[in-house]
């Protein structure tokens, strides 16, 4: 299986929208749903000792949108989701995704959670801050939440890219979060090779075969109705 | 569990879009995906003797859109989908759903399949012609495909409503297709009580709890990551 560089990841994304005519609504729904399924599979079993209260940290772009979708589906799967979503856009889709969360009883807050509150309250953190278009360094307004993620002992599930990591080179000196689980979407990016002791899943079962071939992705087979594949 | 009348079904749908601010893209993707999952579960096992070539009949409205989405996901699950989609709209979403199918190698045709071809070629028919807003009688342009569905021995999976049935009263004298499987979306409609010897599934795992309560739906519990529940 191929690990995409940043340029390839951006190109694949553009082709899905421009050539294959998917809407952001469609693919974000499928991506966020696959994240919720991985989380439910990994941490949601009745035997799991992980608390079902989940902090979902959503960034300003599409990675954050995946997080908002995941939060909604997690709520329907009896997780207690709390969303931190500090920097919002005026795009209808994002306003509506937030509204959908709130009308299902999910709090969507601009207040950065403290380390103490996170450690005391949550069983899991979903990191949906930055995705494959991120370039370091992290902007100052996100420094407080990155500090919480860096210091917290609560397991982190990163959506597509561990936030703050370079998409190709991985952890940076100042941003070195270590997710317990990474959910690569569409295809893994190069930084996923720098994971240590993390579960790694692939989600986003929507890539047209012709596009897989064009980028020589060699994706693994999704079994049955699964929306994800466990890679390691 | 409650079976909705036509007025309730229309109201629930309107609330999902107007109050909960879902887009058609989002809910159609989830609905169509749940249909593909039911079909894969029911007919897609390696032990199944049903041929994996599926005729997906898509009507002019949202029921047809669910069919187009299901066809695309079925293709990704190694079913060989062929779409009959005679009456198309100018809406971007539908143009794009058709394009997505075609760019995955699915033929989308306006030519009504003959009974002989259907019987010889296909292992399954997905009936996504008319949904919960249908009122009999069937328009003349759909008479040929309804005739095929009425006469064919190939198992039919109906999406939300067996096409041609009255949403509340069920089979009509002139339209009395007998699906092998019905996938009710969101909540079953009254006509589902008139099924005989059919499998019955519920899909569309996206109904906000407050909306479920408002309509006293008393939906069954979706287990694990399943996007459907088997009702009978």
From Swiss-Prot, chains A, B:
The lineage of its organism: Eukaryota, Metazoa, Ecdysozoa, Arthropoda, Hexapoda. Its cofactor is K(+). Catalyzes the epimerization of the S- and R-forms of NAD(P)HX, a damaged form of NAD(P)H that is a result of enzymatic or heat-dependent hydration. This is a prerequisite for the S-specific NAD(P)H-hydrate dehydratase to allow the repair of both epimers of NAD(P)HX. PANTHER family: NAD(P)H-HYDRATE EPIMERASE. One of its GO terms (cellular component) is mitochondrion. Keywords: Isomerase, Metal-binding, NAD, NADP, Nucleotide-binding, Potassium. Binds 1 potassium ion per subunit. InterPro entries: YjeF_N_dom, YjeF_N_dom_sf, YJEFN_prot_NAXE-like. (6S)-NADPHX binds at residues 62-66, 131-137, 160. The keyword DNA repair does not apply. It is an enzyme of class 5 (isomerase). Pfam families: YjeF_N. K(+) binds at residues 63, 127, 163. This is NAD(P)H-hydrate epimerase. Coiled coil: none annotated. Residues 9-219 form the YjeF N-terminal domain.
């Amino acid at each position: 299986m191929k690990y995409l560089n940043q340029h390839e990841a951006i190109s694949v994304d553009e082709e899905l929208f421009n050539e294959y005519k998917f809407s952001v609504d469609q693919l974000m729904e499928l991506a966020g749903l696959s994240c919720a399924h991985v989380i439910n599979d990994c941490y949601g079993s009745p035997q799991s000792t992980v608390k079902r209260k989940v902090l979902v940290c959503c960034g300003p772009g599409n990675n954050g949108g995946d997080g908002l979708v995941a939060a909604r589906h997690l709520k329907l799967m009896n997780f207690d989701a709390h969303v931190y979503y500090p920097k919002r856009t005026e795009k209808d889709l994002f306003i509506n995704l937030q509204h959908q969360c709130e009308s299902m009883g999910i709090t969507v807050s601009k207040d950065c959670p403290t380390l103490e509150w996170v450690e005391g309250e949550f069983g899991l953190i979903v990191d949906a801050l930055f995705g494959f278009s991120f370039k370091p360094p992290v902007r100052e307004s996100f420094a407080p939440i990155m500090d919480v993620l860096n210091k917290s002992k609560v397991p982190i599930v990163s959506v597509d890219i561990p936030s703050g990591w370079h998409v190709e080179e991985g952890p940076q000196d100042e941003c070195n979060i270590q997710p317990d689980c990474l959910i690569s979407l569409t295809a893994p990016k190069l930084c996923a090779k720098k994971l240590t002791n993390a579960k790694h899943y692939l989600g986003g079962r929507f890539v047209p075969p012709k596009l897989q071939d064009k980028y020589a992705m060699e994706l693994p087979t999704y079994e049955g109705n699964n929306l994800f594949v466990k890679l390691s």
